[in-house]
């Protein structure tokens, strides 16, 4: 299993499309405008196993208004400016789940970044567990997104 990290500007169109396709396949993110959001990320991480990309994750550069809205929905708006980056788009192909791939991707991204002020949001119970295992802690209240899904906001608490 090999993890590779790139700046989006250093990815070719095939890599960006592969990243996009895996994220859409995971059904955790609205695909509208997704490719542009991927290109705006700080870093993209790919996990390769037997010459196949089996998982992806990113350090996102969140839009300031988007970030404020999330923190407001979680009733912790005053903390929004404390976080530079969002960990996101962490998806492992279904046939390769439960092998530690998302954990490896997220940890490698966080190690690569000079910042340690991360937050993440999720509606997925497995990702909630993984974020807590890595050292994230719940921040604020659960909130409902535009699709009536319940999300949890997490902040990075330091390495465990």
Where are these regions (language model features)?
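C-terminal "cap" of GNAT-fold acetyltransferases
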Residues: 144-160
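Conserved acetyl-CoA-binding loop-helix of GNAT-fold acetyltransferases
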Residues: 88-92, 97-111, 133
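Conserved acyl-donor/pantetheine-binding loop and adjacent beta-alpha core of acyl/acetyltransferases
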Residues: 35-36, 42, 46-93, 97, ...
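Conserved GNAT acetyl-CoA-binding A-motif
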Residues: 111-124
């Amino acid at each position: 299993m090999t993890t590779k990290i790139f700046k989006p500007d250093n990815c070719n169109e095939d890599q960006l499309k592969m990243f996009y396709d895996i994220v859409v396949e995971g059904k955790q993110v609205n695909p509208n405008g997704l490719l542009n959001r991927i290109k705006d990320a700080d870093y993209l991480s790919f996990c390769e196993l037997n010459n196949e990309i089996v998982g992806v994750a990113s350090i996102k550069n969140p839009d300031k208004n988007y970030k404020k809205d999330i923190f407001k929905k979680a009733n912790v708006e005053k903390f929004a400016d404390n976080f530079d980056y969002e960990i996101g788009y962490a998806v492992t192909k279904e046939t390769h789940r439960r092998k530690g791939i998302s954990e490896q991707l997220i940890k490698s991204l966080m190690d690569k970044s000079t910042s340690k002020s991360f937050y993440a949001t999720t509606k997925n119970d497995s990702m909630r567990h993984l974020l807590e295992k890595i050292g994230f802690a719940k921040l604020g209240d659960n909130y409902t997104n535009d699709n009536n899904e319940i999300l949890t906001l997490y902040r990075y608490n330091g390495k465990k």
